[in-house]
Amino acid sequence: FHVDKPETPGYKIELPEDGAKQIVEKKSDTVEEVDIASLLAMGDLAHGEKVFKKCSACHVVDKGGENKIGPALYGVLGRKVAAIESYKYSSAMAAYDKEWTFEEMNGYLKKPQSHIKGTKMAFAGLRKEKDRASVILYLNQNSDSPLPLP
């Protein structure tokens, strides 16, 4: 049995000349802003604790918990981004001069690398809105002073 090696590896996909443009336009048409109150209403604390197990390889959420690969997240909502002095953040994260609001956390959890370009967090993100909403509620609960929900 013998198979000749192709000149160029891969598959050729034929598109109409304006096909790529149509695909890009269609994708951008579906982008919509999420109302954070509606998003958080989808959340569930028990589900958030379960989903957070993906995060627990690198983060702790216990009061007084030590930094791991990532910073400790107890009381993260409402505090300044990159605020834990004992953790060495990426320069991108350290320069990101914002506070962890519900909206900021939602954007970051959705796609960390896109939300803060240059972050060293390698996690791809949480695609499902319910997962993000639940983790945000779980993080907010793990605080001495949880933020009031919108």
Predicted features along the sequence, with ranges:
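C-terminal capping alpha-helices of c-type cytochrome domains
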Residues: 1-2, 99-150
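N-terminal post-signal-peptidase region of extra-cytosolic proteins
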Residues: 36-41, 56-60, 88-89
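Gly/Gly-Pro-rich "capping" loops immediately C-terminal to redox-active cysteine motifs
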Residues: 49, 63-102, 122-126
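The canonical Cys-X-X-Cys-His
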Residues: 48, 52-61, 135-139
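Electrostatic cytochrome c docking/interface patches
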Residues: 20-52
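N-terminal targeting signals for export/organelle localization
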Residues: 1-22
